[in-house]
Amino acid sequence: MLNVHYFFDPMCGWCYGASSLVGVLADIPEFEIIYHPGGMIPKQAIDPSFRQHILQADAQIANMTKAHFGDAYKARVTGTEDYIVDSYSTTRAFLVGQEMGIEAHVMLAAIQKAHYQDGQHLDELNVLADLAVSMGLDKATWNEKMADSEAKMRSQVQESHDLMGQLQVSGYPTFILEKEDRLMRLPHSNYYGKTEEWKNYLAEWV
């Protein structure tokens, strides 16, 4: 079994662009993904002047990765209402989803779709609860676990930051392969939008 350390954030656009690469990696039984959430954006309203930059970056991501950004999401970014982004609540949901039996890559992809395609307000805990229910999870259990998830989330984010410092990781997404006591950064950006080539590349390590 080969470990791949994945440094990411649920609200990172390039991580959304890399979601198909994560899916390929998760489907190869010889690899185990170790997820390191980064807590990129504490809950905050994005300044209107920065929204145009987001749209430009999204266009670049879509062009390079073939990821789809939905109309509902774009309407939120360009709208007159506050556009609130929260890495912490979505990371809590990511962790609780796994605790309740959802595979990590499936939970992450569902959160990313809800944000980047469906334009849902994932800073609101009731919206995250509805997402959990749509994935077959019990709402009462979900709410109970979410209420207790803050400390674990902050601990995981701090561990991620510590490891990022040790490994000189400066951004998301980053994939680092651990093999025979060696750590190697995988050139994932060479394979954006090229899942078959990515699969063939990964097979060389097995």
PLM regions: where:
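Extreme N-terminal starter segment of soluble prokaryotic enzymes
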Residues: 1-5
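Short metal-coordination and nucleic-acid-contact micro-motifs, chiefly zinc-binding Cys/His arrays
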Residues: 8
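C-terminal cap of thioredoxin/glutaredoxin-like
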Residues: 11, 19-25, 113-206
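Structural alpha/beta surface segment adjacent to cysteine/selenocysteine redox centers
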Residues: 16-116
